[in-house]
């Protein structure tokens, strides 16, 4: 749960021009269901004390594991361009408390590759998002999608299952037109649409 809302917050940090590393990126002692910062493992790295560990001296055995929130940082670090691109939804569903379920942030890098970060905060419903890139024909471009999604909003990494929640990546596909992205309930994805590579002209029959 916490990872999805961290993703929403970090996207707003970027939109405002603020370094998202200012969002806390801390380690903390692991305890079931919560840590010192609050419920649902607020810190992105959890530290597990061994039986011989001394937290005062730092001596003894300690192990570490990443929370889903850490993967949000990793996805943004590896899937983001330097220039923000305007995004808008034709319609945004809301939850019972009035909060919007969908968020998007798009960017381009220096090579012209497009990155679209999408959040579906709805805990009950998947959403299909039809991407329309204004002024760009993406047919023939290559697309990859990184996903952070689970079957349950209470899913978490633990010392026993440190990789229960992790990032998956779909196989690269060649687009035939504007893609439709399936956003699972309570998920975060980053879509990368690579700039089409212009084929080199065949000069084999050119005469001097």
Task: Give residue spans per PLM region.
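Aromatic/acidic polysaccharide-binding cleft in carbohydrate-active enzymes
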Residues: 1-103, 110
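Acidic, Ser/Thr/Pro-rich beta/coil linker or hinge segments at domain junctions
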Residues: 136-183
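Short beta-strand-to-coil "C-cap" segments at the C-terminal boundary of structured domains/repeats
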Residues: 191-199
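Disulfide-bonded cysteine-rich modules in secreted/extracellular proteins
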Residues: 199-208
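Extracellular and organelle-lumenal recognition/adhesion modules and their flexible linkers in secreted
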Residues: 109, 170-173, 205
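Carbohydrate-binding surface patches
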Residues: 97-138, 145-150, 186-192
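Flexible loop/turn segments at secondary-structure boundaries
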Residues: 28-33, 123-126, 152-155, 198-199
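Generic detection of short hydrophobic beta-strand segments and adjacent strand-loop junctions
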Residues: 85-93, 127-131, 165, 169-175, ...
